[in-house]
Structure formats: C-alpha cells, structure tokens
Amino acid sequence: MELDACIKGRRSVRAYTDEPVSKEQMEAVLEAGTWAPTGMGREPWQFIIIKDKNLIKLVSDETKQLVKQAMPPLAERFSTDVDIICYNAPTLVLVCTEKDPQWANVNLLDSVLATENMFLKAYELGLGTCYMGFVQLLNNKPEVLRNLGVPENLEMTVPFIIGHPKSKQGRGERQKPNVLKWIK
C-alpha cells in the first residue's frame, strides 16, 4: 500500500468483529512502532497487550466512572451499558514509559510517534485502531494499573484499541493545512 493512501485512508475504528488479532499481526504492528523517531534515540516505549475480555471491560467500566467524576457535563453520555470506551475491541494496547518528570514530555511525544507508526501498519494489514484518550485517567488508579500489569515505575502514555473492523470506514474530508505564515 502506498504511504499516501495509508495516511489518507486510516480512520479511527469504533466497531469490531470478534476475530482476534493474530500474534503475527500484533508483532508486525509493534515492530512498526519501534521504528518511530525518538528523542535522543531513547526508545522509551514499552507495550502491554491485553486480550482478556474481562480486563478490557474493567478498563471500560473504570474509565467511564472516572470520566463522569472528572467531567460532569459528560456524565449522562457515559452512564450507559454500551461500551463507549473500548467499543468491544478484541485487543487493548497500552503504550507505557517510565515515570520521569525530566523526560515526561519527550516520552509522551515519542509514544505518540510510535503509535502513529503502529496505526499506519495496522491499517496496511487491514486492521482498525482507535486512540483511547480517556483511558489515561487510569494513571490515577494504581490498583487498576496493577491489574493490567503496569509496573509501578511506568505510566500509560497512549492507550489504543485494535481489531478487525466490522465495516469499511468512509473517507472523511480534511481541512487544508492551516499555515499561520511562511517566513522567508
């Protein structure tokens, strides 16, 4: 697949089949992440792959509760039995880095760069992905992180779901680049 087609075709997927992501597919996706640019060549990312449906449900349930507490205007939307966090995806990936205040911003950016590589590779393989920003609220719930296998010295930087899309995603329109000014 051409890079331009991959970049423009990838969409956030929120509906998945029950078909599992194979180990080979997941390894290819993770390897793509390790080829991302990284500050000072540190490659700070570590990955936790969760396929256990009960743990994924725990993540969804705990995250919904935290969103309702942290953002009252969203409380009604998050008071549902429908999984509007992990969307019943078969796999949840936690990109984690060490808790290090000096490197926190760099670690976050490195994790985001690695994740974009993984998203593009997943799309190339016919898989769908979606960034789960609200799941980061679980960084304030050490008991949940322990259940997910996140060591105490690490924090989640980018959680995302991955699986086989239920349907083909439509192409959305994007705005033209918003260039403030060209400086010559």
Regions found by a protein language model. Name each.
Residues 144-155:
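Short, electropositive alpha-helical surface patch
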Residues 49-51, 94, 161:
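Short, well-ordered beta-strand micro-motif
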Residues 6, 90-97:
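Short, basic/glycine-rich phosphate-binding loops at helix/coil junctions
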Residues 16, 102-106, 169:
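A generic structural signal for short coil/turn motifs at secondary-structure boundaries
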Residues 33, 93, 99-144:
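Small-aliphatic-rich amphipathic alpha-helix that forms the alpha element of a beta-alpha
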Residues 5-12, 155-184:
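C-terminal helix-cap and adjacent tail motif
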Residues 1-88, 183-184:
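N-terminal amphipathic, basic helical "cap/leader" segment at the start of enzyme domains
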Residues 90-92, 129, 155-157:
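Structural motif
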